[in-house]
């Protein structure tokens, strides 16, 4: 595998050449194709992480992503690019950005994109080689090719009226209100904690500092990453991905990097944000850096990196590393975020079966017809007063499985992939606290795509995303409960 060692070697043309070669190898090999998801965006070649520029332009949905096509490990960041018409089948285009300019040879880091008339405008973090100083830059394109503005970088330390860590100022969120462009970014303040700062411009050239809209006082981790800002169902929303958070099982936070939603009110005169509610977005091991967009039909959609920084689970022999979650529809109820798979998922369903099953106490059973690695499973049940737990195993083979455990006694849901075949040097267990509804009825939905499991509990009040790497032939699904348990189900194979 060729690795270009000098930043001067990086170009869109070379990245595109590498991508095409890698895709052709995978297309020609049934073995390589068998490793890839059917309806999630996965890296076309090498490494991907954060979703970038999630947006609609020219009647298509565009998703860019942090990209290093030359190995399956993180390296100098490019922007990969894919488009879709149905949110399910992605077509890869040539990479949009490469670290090939004097102001971004240290990498083209994360950012966002908007449709503005006939132009597709990208805001991204440009990293200076050597000193790793991070600034914000602009590129303008037609949906296929993107040109960096000659005036880049657009926003630097000169635009900020206070001291901060100049190696930690990144991830611009771009939006437009009336005729004014706004750009929100995150930076590390003098005490090491993160802040969400806002700038404005009339022409994408001259930017004025507006406010510190919100910041961590070290209670929400340290440096913040990948901010988003939008309004939904009458509520203003800021999304951030804080680093170095401390575990708080009651609030759903775990040690390390988290992804957090803050609902409240943004004062449009002072551009200061008042929080009403703060919570985890997804409680799973493999979810980070979510980004949203507004669909033409008015839905707020979200997608995230289905991976994690604290240890990588992708097998070393893969030609690629990194996937995105399913696009999810969002809504806010009483300040709380609810998520559900984009409704386009329903078009993939086939061979549906439905019924109910009475589980005997402490006996593992299979349900006829319920098996596979590409499926959509809907479960509904009333938790018996005396029932302590329900266990569901997926990707069950002769010597492997991954399992969800619903601990009703202690109000915990956990995922355990320690026996899945996934490499042992990454985290294998995660749990979170949930509330059992007053009527004790729980609805949940699990979507599996070869090596990923996205679970939505209590109609999307809780999301729980995890990946696992088990042999493809491991396709069993079993259920067990501590006491007699009635389970209603719908099960669909997914194309």
Question: Where are these predicted regions, by residue range?
Answer:
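Beta-rich carbohydrate-recognition and catalytic domains
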Residues: 1-171, 176-220, 231-283, 304-356, ...
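Catalytic-domain carbohydrate-binding cleft regions of carbohydrate-active enzymes
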Residues: 221, 226
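Beta-rich accessory regions
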Residues: 3-5, 22-27, 257-495
């Amino acid at each position: 595998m060729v690795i270009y060692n000098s930043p001067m070697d990086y170009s869109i043309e070379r990245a595109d050449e590498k991508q095409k070669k890698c895709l052709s190898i995978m297309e020609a090999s049934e073995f390589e194709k068998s490793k890839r998801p059917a309806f999630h965006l996965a890296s076309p070649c090498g490494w991907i992480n954060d979703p970038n520029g999630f947006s609609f332009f020219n009647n298509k949905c565009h998703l860019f992503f942090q990209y290093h096509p030359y190995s399956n490990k993180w390296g100098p960041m490019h922007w990969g690019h894919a488009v879709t018409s149905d949110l399910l089948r992605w077509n890869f285009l040539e990479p949009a950005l490469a670290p090939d300019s004097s102001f971004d040879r240290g990498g083209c880091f994360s950012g966002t994109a908007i449709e503005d008339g006939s132009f597709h405008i990208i805001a991204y973090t440009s990293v200076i080689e050597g000193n790793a100083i991070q600034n914000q830059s602009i590129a303008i394109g037609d949906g296929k090719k993107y040109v960096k503005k000659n005036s880049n970088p657009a926003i630097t330390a000169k635009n900020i009226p206070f001291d901060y860590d100049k190696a930690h100022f990144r991830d611009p969120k771009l939006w437009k209100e009336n005729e004014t462009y706004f750009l929100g970014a995150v930076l590390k303040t003098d005490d090491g904690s993160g802040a969400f700062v806002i700038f404005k411009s009339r022409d994408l050239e001259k930017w004025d500092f507006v406010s510190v809209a919100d910041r961590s006082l070290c209670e929400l981790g340290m440096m913040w990453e990948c901010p988003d800002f939008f309004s939904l169902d009458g509520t203003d929303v800021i999304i951030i991905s804080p680093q170095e958070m401390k575990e708080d099982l009651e609030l759903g936070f775990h040690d390390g990097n988290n992804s957090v939603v803050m609902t409240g009110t943004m004062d449009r005169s002072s551009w200061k944000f008042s929080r009403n509610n703060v919570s985890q977005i997804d409680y799973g091991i493999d979810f980070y850096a979510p980004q949203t967009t507004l669909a033409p039909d008015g839905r707020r959609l979200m997608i995230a990196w289905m991976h994690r920084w604290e240890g990588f689970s992708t097998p070393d022999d893969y030609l690629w590393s990194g996937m995105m979650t399913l696009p999810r529809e969002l809504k806010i109820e009483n300040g709380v975020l609810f998520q559900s798979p984009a409704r386009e998922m329903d078009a993939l369903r086939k061979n549906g079966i439905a019924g109910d099953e009475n589980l005997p106490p402490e006996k593992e059973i299979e349900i006829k017809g319920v098996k596979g690695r590409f499926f959509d499973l809907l479960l509904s049940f009333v938790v018996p007063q005396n029932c302590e737990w329900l266990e569901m195993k997926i990707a069950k083979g002769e010597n492997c499985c991954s399992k969800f455990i619903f601990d009703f006694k202690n109000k915990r849901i956990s995922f355990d992939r320690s026996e899945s075949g996934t490499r042992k040097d990454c985290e294998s267990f995660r749990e979170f606290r949930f509330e059992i509804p007053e009527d004790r009825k729980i609805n949940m939905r699990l979507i599996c795509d070869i090596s990923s499991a996205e679970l939505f509990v209590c109609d999307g009040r809780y999301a729980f995303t995890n990946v696992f790497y088990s042999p493809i032939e491991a396709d069993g699904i079993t259920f067990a409960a501590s006491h007699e348990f009635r389970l209603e189900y719908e099960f669909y194979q997914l194309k």
